[in-house]
């Protein structure tokens, strides 16, 4: 087996509140890639990308990538990345984002993770005002993952569950019926429902403060 090549670069493809996506170039020989986070191995395989999950918000991590063959392990290349401090929602995609291939115009694993983070966050937020929302978002998407029919249905059911609670109090946009041929406008609608849900919760909390005089601290804002 050949001596492992040294990778030339590792690229940050994106980050959310709890996940980081990384990519690198394939070598010219058969080898595996070993990825370390802060000195501990988190992934090893032949793929040239990886999404690391279960991270803390607003935290900086150092990733090091090496190449491995039976002859040994190469020197590593490193990159640092900081996770988002809050859930980020995108509601301003345009047709140009799609046609020009911009990041906002592509719906990928990190979008599924971001939305899942928001759904989990909103479930907790609704519970603070006594409202139960039955959701269970998937948060461990990888870059090559294509949602199965069941996963796509569950993804939209979580959005519809939040929308259902929202419609008891105010109007909002409709959720798409399917992820097949999802348009940029429908992608915006999904995250508008999440943003409107947060606005509703804030309004309930403010009303409760006004009528009861109780002070509720630590209201977290979705950007």
Predicted regions and their residues:
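Recognizes extended acidic, P/S/T-rich segments that occur
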Residues: 30-58, 70-77
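Short, flexible active-site loop motifs that bind/organize anionic cofactors or intermediates
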Residues: 10, 40-42, 51, 102, ...
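Pro/Thr/Ser/Gly-rich low-complexity, intrinsically disordered linker/stalk tracts
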Residues: 1-29, 57, 69-91
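Extracellular "spike/adhesin" assembly and maturation modules
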Residues: 84-223
């Amino acid at each position: 087996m050949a001596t492992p090549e040294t990778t030339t670069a590792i690229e940050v493809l994106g980050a959310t509140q709890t996940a980081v996506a990384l990519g690198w170039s394939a070598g010219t020989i058969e080898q595996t890639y070993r990825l370390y986070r802060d000195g501990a191995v988190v992934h090893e395989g032949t793929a040239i990308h990886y999404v690391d999950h279960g991270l803390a918000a607003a935290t900086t991590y150092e990733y090091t990538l090496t190449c491995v063959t039976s002859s040994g392990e190469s020197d590593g290349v490193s990159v640092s990345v900081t996770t988002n401090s809050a859930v980020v929602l995108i509601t301003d995609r345009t047709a140009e984002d799609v046609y020009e291939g911009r990041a906002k115009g592509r719906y990928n694993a990190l979008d599924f993770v971001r939305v899942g983070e928001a759904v989990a966050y909103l479930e907790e937020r609704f519970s603070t005002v006594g409202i139960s929302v039955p959701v269970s978002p998937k948060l461990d998407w990888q870059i090559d993952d294509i949602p199965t029919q069941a996963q796509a249905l569950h993804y939209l059911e979580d959005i519809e569950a939040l929308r259902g609670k929202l419609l008891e109090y105010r109007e909002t946009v409709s959720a798409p019926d399917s992820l097949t041929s999802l348009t940029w406008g429908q992608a915006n609608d999904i995250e508008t429902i999440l943003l409107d849900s947060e606005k509703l919760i804030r309004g309930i909390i403010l009303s409760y403060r006004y009528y009861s005089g109780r002070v509720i601290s630590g209201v977290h804002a979705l950007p």
